[in-house]
């Protein structure tokens, strides 16, 4: 086994794992969004995907005739997205500070508003993002998002384990009540020929109370 290293957030190894092992969330969100758009009579137009990841949602939207603009901070994720959905426009920017173009829909799937990849992620920053989303949406537009809430402290198991033939991922969830946060210590082992490469990442998620 090779020496391990600490990666950027969603570096090459974890981006590959997320893309191949956890596509279901983005696929389900895309199906829900497409169904809602069509039911609303919105069959053409731009969808802005905040935290677009590897472009799974973008691909499905493009296949239905929508234009897509995706924004993410991970170089590795954006490389996957550009390969999967070359017709889309992708930008590497902070979700907290990016410009959001006029859109018939904006989506932010995968708890991207919770991640503290940008240290400026706080209630004021989230308020500003939501204001920009509101300004960007055309009449009748749709905003689809998810967030991790404080009850995640009770729901998230202390440790999680995922494995395929080509990779193994171990996740330790560390809870904090002051402030309300979850820290995920992620160790990934990815097959590289006859060996496995270990890559560690630490993700901090600010838990958001929807009632505040």
Predicted features along the sequence, with ranges:
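Class I SAM-dependent methyltransferase SAM/SAH-binding core
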Residues: 48, 54-97
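A short SAM/SAH-binding and catalytic strip from SAM-dependent methyltransferases
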Residues: 104-124
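A short glycine-rich, Lys/Arg-flanked "PGG" loop and its adjoining helix->strand segment in the class I
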Residues: 124-139
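A short acidic, Gly/Pro-enriched loop at the edge of an enzyme's catalytic core
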Residues: 96-106
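Conserved class I S-adenosyl-L-methionine
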Residues: 1-42
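SAM-dependent methyltransferase
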Residues: 144-212
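Non-membrane alpha-helical structural segments and their capping/turn regions in soluble enzymes
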Residues: 27, 75, 120-127
């Amino acid at each position: 086994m090779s020496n391990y290293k600490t990666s950027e957030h969603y570096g090459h190894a974890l981006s590959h794992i997320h893309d191949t092992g956890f596509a279901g969330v983005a696929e389900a969100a895309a199906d829900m969004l497409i169904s809602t758009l069509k039911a609303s009579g919105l069959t053409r137009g731009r969808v802005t995907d905040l935290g677009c990841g590897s472009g799974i949602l973008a691909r499905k939207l493009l296949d239905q005739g929508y234009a897509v603009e995706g924004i993410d901070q991970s170089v590795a994720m954006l490389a996957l997205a550009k390969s999967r959905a070359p017709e889309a426009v992708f930008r590497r920017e902070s979700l907290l500070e990016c410009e959001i173009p006029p859109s018939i829909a904006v989506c932010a799937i995968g708890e991207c508003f919770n991640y503290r990849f940008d240290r400026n992620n706080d209630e004021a920053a989230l308020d500003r993002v939501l204001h920009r989303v509101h300004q960007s949406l055309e009449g009748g537009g749709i905003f689809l998002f998810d967030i991790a809430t404080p009850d995640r402290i009770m729901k998230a198991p202390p440790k999680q384990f995922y494995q395929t033939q080509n990779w193994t991922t171990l996740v330790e969830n560390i809870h904090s009540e002051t402030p309300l946060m979850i820290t995920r210590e992620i160790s990934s082992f990815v097959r590289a020929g006859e060996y496995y490469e270990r890559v560690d990442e630490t993700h901090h998620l600010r838990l958001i109370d929807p009632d505040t």
